[in-house]
Amino acid sequence: MGPSSSLTTIVATVLLVTLFGSAYASNFFDEFDLTWGDHRGKIFNGGNMLSLSLDQVSGSGFKSKKEYLFGRIDMQLKLVAGNSAGTVTAYYLSSQGATHDEIDFEFLGNETGKPYVLHTNVFAQGKGDREQQFYLWFDPTKNFHTYSIVWRPQHIIFLVDNLPIRVFNNAEKLGVPFPKSQPMRIYSSLWNADDWATRGGLVKTDWSKAPFTAYYRGFNAAACTASSGCDPKFKSSFGDGKLQVATELNAYGRRRLRWVQKYFMIYNYCSDLKRFPRGFPPECKKSRV
């Protein structure tokens, strides 16, 4: 295969994933409830946009009406602009209770001109402590960008603009719990965490810049729900059809994953010797792609 045909294959792959992730945007009125923050959360533009705001009194949040058990979840976000130090925008899947499962994106704000930190984590049966953190290769406050979670029985894939940044593989054979039996809702919140979010809490929230606002659009869930079974779009992605690339990593996807982790990962619990002086958690052996 020559260079031109290789490039064509790569472009086609990216296009297929992009189409799968964005062609079925849903209405926020139909899919979500604003759960806290009084009127600081808003759904507008006919249900095509949602915003969360934070001031010195309160933050705000929302959750999905449906519970999901496996699927691909896409959301476009534009994060708090300017001096966002001390703020956290969280976007995640979670069940409830002491033994809950959870799949996290958390965006840790920073001082003007300094990069956001994207914090990821996976909880299974109430246990987390599986953090990986990244800088982004763009300014997430200037435009909307797509943040996706692919949740399958075999693995969880975190994607940013359809580029994989993290894979958490099922390592139950090694005795590691994996989220696979508890349906989860989608949650998001914007809140003050200046006791830890920016430089370990050294930089506090500048309330003179409030209200802080994050924006959402382009939600899509090609998924299985606890109440009505599997979306046909997600079912087709399990088969041999052209959409399989949307829930699996091909060779190009694995190369892009390695690129992100080489140049933009700033913390990986699987390489933290101070935290695990007696050996890394067993799932770390399966974390390489």
From Swiss-Prot:
In the record, which residues are listed under signal peptide? 1-25
> What does the PTM comment state?
Contains at least one intrachain disulfide bond essential for its enzymatic activity.
**Residues modified by glycosylation:** 110
Activity-pH dependence: Optimum pH is 6 for the XET activity.
> Which sites are catalytic?
102 (nucleophile), 106 (proton donor)
Q: Which Gene Ontology cellular component terms are annotated? A: apoplast
Q: Which PROSITE patterns match?
A: GH16_1, GH16_2
SUPFAM superfamilies membership = Concanavalin A-like lectins/glucanases
Task: Enumerate the residues marked as the site Important for catalytic activity.
Answer: 104
Keyword annotations from UniProtKB, A to Z: Apoplast, Cell wall, Cell wall biogenesis/degradation, Disulfide bond, Glycoprotein, Glycosidase, Hydrolase, Secreted, Signal, Transferase
Induction info reads: Down-regulated by auxin. Down-regulated by aluminum. Repressed by far-red light (FRc).
Q: Which GO terms describe its biological process?
A: cell wall biogenesis; cell wall organization; response to far red light; xyloglucan metabolic process
Residues where xyloglucan binds: 106, 119-121, 129-131, 195-196, 200, 275
Effect of inactivating the gene: No visible growth defects, but increased aluminum resistance.
Regarding tissue, the record states:
Strongly expressed in roots, hypocotyls and cotyledons. Aslo detected in inflorescence stems and in the carpels and styles in flowers.
A GO term, aspect molecular function: polysaccharide binding
- Where the record annotates domain GH16, the positions are 26-216
| Protein EC | 2.4.1.207, 3.2.1.151
Q: Cellular location of this protein?
A: Secreted, Cell wall; Secreted, Extracellular space, Apoplast
The set of disulfide-linked cysteines is 224-230, 270-284
Tell me the Pfam families matching this sequence: Glyco_hydro_16 (PF00722), XET_C (PF06955)
Q: Which family does it belong to?
A: Belongs to the glycosyl hydrolase 16 family. XTH group 2 subfamily.
Protein name, UniProt field:
Xyloglucan endotransglucosylase/hydrolase protein 15
Q: Which organism is it from?
A: Arabidopsis thaliana
Q: What lineage, starting at the top, does this entry show? A: Eukaryota, Viridiplantae, Streptophyta, Embryophyta, Tracheophyta
